[in-house]
Each structure stands twice: as structure tokens, then as C-alpha cells.
UniProtKB/Swiss-Prot annotation:
GO terms for biological process: tRNA modification. This is tRNA(Ile)-lysidine synthase. Its EC number is 6.3.4.19. It comes from the Bacteria. The lineage of its organism: Bacteria, Pseudomonadati, Pseudomonadota, Alphaproteobacteria, Hyphomicrobiales. One of its GO terms (cellular component) is cytoplasm. It holds the Pfam family ATP_bind_3. Gene3D superfamilies: HUPs.
Amino acid sequence: MPHAVLDTARNFLRSFITPRRILVAVSGGSDSMGLLVALHSAIAADERRGFSLAACTVDHALRPQSACEAEDVAAFCAALGIAHRICRWEGAKPSTGIQAAARNKRYELLAEAADALGADCIAIGHTRDDQQETVAMRIARGKGDGAGDGQGEGHGGAGMAASMLYGRRIWVLRPFLGLARAEIRSFLQARGVSWIDDPSNANPAFERVRVRARIATSGGMPTPLGNGRQRAASSARAAALIEKRIRVHEALVAEVSARHAGEIDDPDWRRALLTVASVLGGREHMPAFATVQRLSQFLRSGEPGRMTAGRVVFDRRASGLYLYREARNLPVLAVGPGRQGAWDGRFTVKSRGPAVTVAADASGRLWTKRLIDAGLPAGIAKRGSTVAPEIASTDGAGLAFGEAPAQVEYHIGLYDTFLPGFDRIMADAVAVSFGRDRYPAPPVHDVLIEMET
């Protein structure tokens, strides 16, 4: 008899543009075990040529039993003939924010395992239950803190994307977002497959556990259908506006015409403008709700002047609106020989040999000239230039931005670590504006990427 879990796995494999080697993240819990078993069965039964599986268990070393549980998963994979790797989170753990830190480390270790096992992408067993919890948490956080586009307008309601690019290099796919956990457990029970229940999933000290309990006692909550597609459509519209209305000069100054500067009440334009501002400011998140409210009032007024929001100066003049990083709290970064580092959340500096020091270019003469030549007012060019990085070798010799012995590339904090699939079009528009290549395309068809609910 057909089963929804197996059908979902088959449809997931059919969504690939070409067959791939898939790394399945397997904790030993029901969701990930169900994903592993379903994909293994689908590949075997349908004779999906060219597909293969590998698996990885991340041992966070937060519980005494975790090492044995990881070995149990390894034995299960061995019985199925699936290559498996255990990656352990070594070192000290933070005393606060442990779940967020564990999540970041988990993706880092999974990406390393994918490289080691020759996998092209990673599959994770997040379910509809996880999606409901995520939506509930993001909506709660969005009330008053500007989650999403800076107005609390429900980007959190889109939940987790069915695809996510990690670290600009490997796609993480979530094929089970439309399935309930109960369906997956029924599928496993029918096949006599057991799973591990992590006691931390019942610990009310964690926000997700508390949200899960509230959802259960309230009889469940609907996951808004189509929000991922709505988010993708909004991203596409915002991307078009970035391309048409915003000129980014030398990755230092963004220019907007006077005509469009005050149209902040258009949600797609607001999102486009705030996205570019966040990138210029080296931020990983959009501005907070209260900040956006003040900024919107300033832009609506049409009056010339300057306002700072999210480390970015919004400089409004008769000729247009100009955005640039404020000249405050600019760091000094030491980069060792052959190493790389992130400066000010905006630039990645890779040493090609000797150690270098990165600091703000106090004089900014080179960049002032370039920005003036690009048509910017002299005052704007000067202000934008003083926040450019200057690289000095250990012997103190100054080096021009991007010249040997260091390579400099713009860092896009909003997207370079985690890029949801439904934001890829906008992320590409931002990358091109800042002189970067587009992000890698996903291995599955776009029409299926966004089926996250």
C-alpha cells in the first residue's frame, strides 16, 4: 500500500535536476530515521539510477548517552550499506544560547561531512510539526522587534524554507516539511524501525519545547499555506527594485533617486532598501521595528538631512538619497599569514602570504576620487571613502583595497551563512550590486523548492 512518507521521498528524488549523492543528517530521532529509511527504500524500489546516500550523525556531546546513540545510528546505516560518519562537537559549550550555538555547529559539521563523503547536498528531516513551531516562534518575536522586513509583516510566517544554501557552497533540503511527525512514526513502526527520544525535546527551559506544549494544548495551529511562495514572490519583486532603483558604488555607497527616496510605504521597496542598508552596515539581520518606524518618518518627510539606522547613514539631499556605513566603531583586524578574517561584517580579507592588518582608510583619497568619478557628490564620496578597508602588511606598507598580498571580497551577512531558497533571487540581486558572483543554484527544480508547507 502506498504511504505518504514513501511517496514524499519519491517525489523529492524526482525533483532533482540530475541524480545526486545525498547526505542525510540522522540524529537517531524519528524524523531523521524516517527520512533515511524512506529515501533508501525509494532509491531501491524505484531503481533511481545515479542517486546514492551517505549519512552523518552530529554528536553535540551535551548528554552522556549521545556517543552511544551515534554509534547505534552508525550500526543501522552499516546494515543498510550506507556510508556513515560521526562528527563530534568538541570544546567548551556556551552557557547561554546553547540551542542556537548547537544549530550553527551542526550545519558546519554536516557541511564538512558532506565534503568528506562526496555528497552534493544535505537532507534534513524537519517536519510540519517543526514548521508550526518555527512559525509560532518567529511571529511571536516579530511583534515589536521588526522581524522580517523591518515592519513585523510576517516574513517569519513563511517559516523554514524547503531549501537553504549554507555557507555559499552546499544546499540543505527539507523534503518532509509537509508531513506530520505522527505519519513518520507510523511509517517506521510498520517497518519495525525504532528511534531515539532526546530528553532535551521535553525540557521546558527551551523556547521550542514551550511553544510545542502550547500548540498541543490549543489543539494545534494551522501552518499558513503558500507563505513560502508569497515570500519568494516578494523577494523577486524586491530584487527587481534593487536592480532598477539602487546603484551601489564600489560596495561603499548606495544611491537612490530623489523620486524613489520617499516611497517607503511600498512593502517591497521598503524591503529592498532595508536589505541593501543591512548589507552596507555589515548586519546579519534587518533593522528593528522601532528603528524602521523612525526611518520611515524621516524618508516620508522629504526633507534633506541625515539619519543613522543600523550603522548606516541615510543622507538625503536634493539630488537623491545616499546610504553609507557610519564612521564609528570601525575595528582593526589582524590576519595571519595565509589566513582569512572578516572585517566589520562587510569584507572578507584573505592573506596571500604575509600577515596583514586591516583598518579603516582614514584618508580615503583613492576611494574619494573613484566615487566622485562615478558621479557622486564630493561630500558623499568623502564620507563613503573613510569606511573602506585599508590593508597594511606587517612591515607597515600600505596596500590598495583588493591588491596583493591580500584578496578582499564583500561579505553579505544576511545571506552568506544561511540563504533560504525563497530569498535566492533577491540575494543574487544584492550580490551582483556589490560586485559578487551570484549564489550557487539549488540541485532541485525551483517549483518544488518552495513547497515548504
